[in-house]
Structure formats: C-alpha cells, structure tokens
C-alpha cells in the first residue's frame, strides 16, 4: 500500500439503541446504529407487529373508498 493516501483505520465501539455495544474497526471515530443482532427480529425470533390496519383505513378515508363486503359462509 502507498504511504499517506489511506485513511486511519481505528478500533471502535459500535453502539446500538437497544444498549448493546461491540468492538469493530472503521475509518469513522464512532458508529451508532438503530438495530443490531441482539434486537433485530430475524435474530431474536420476536416479530414486531405494524399498524397496517390504520394505514388502510386512512387510505380508504382519504379516497372515499368503502370497505369491501366480507364473505360470510
């Protein structure tokens, strides 16, 4: 490698919003992340439910669309 053209590569602590932290290497001084392997649903097996029903209702209200009739058996 050429001398003097590469950024300094430091050992840093990466901090997650869940409180977890781990060591890594980067050219940045510090890194903070919103999701890590300790809190991501894929790794934890816990699913976070999103409020999609509220979004659908807002869409229908905005465009004045009546709800589809439900099929009863």
UniProtKB/Swiss-Prot annotation:
Record carries keyword Translocase: no
Keyword Metal-binding among record annotations: yes
Cofactor note: Binds 1 zinc ion per subunit.
BP term (GO), one: translation
Keywords on record: Metal-binding, Ribonucleoprotein, Ribosomal protein, RNA-binding, rRNA-binding, Zinc
GO MF assignments: metal ion binding; rRNA binding; structural constituent of ribosome
Lineage top rank: taxon: Bacteria
Binding residue positions for Zn(2+): 16, 18, 36, 39
Signal peptide as annotated in the record: none
UniProt-listed Pfam families: Ribosomal_L31
Assigned GO CC terms: ribonucleoprotein complex; ribosome
InterPro entries documented for this protein: Ribosomal_bL28/bL31-like_sf, Ribosomal_bL31, Ribosomal_bL31_A, Ribosomal_bL31_sf
UniProt cofactor(s): Zn(2+)
Subunit structure: Part of the 50S ribosomal subunit.
Family to which this protein belongs: Belongs to the bacterial ribosomal protein bL31 family. Type A subfamily.
Function of the molecule: Binds the 23S rRNA.
Name the record gives this protein: Large ribosomal subunit protein bL31
Species in which this protein is naturally found: Citrifermentans bemidjiense (strain ATCC BAA-1014 / DSM 16622 / JCM 12645 / Bem)
Classification lineage: Bacteria, Pseudomonadati, Thermodesulfobacteriota, Desulfuromonadia, Geobacterales
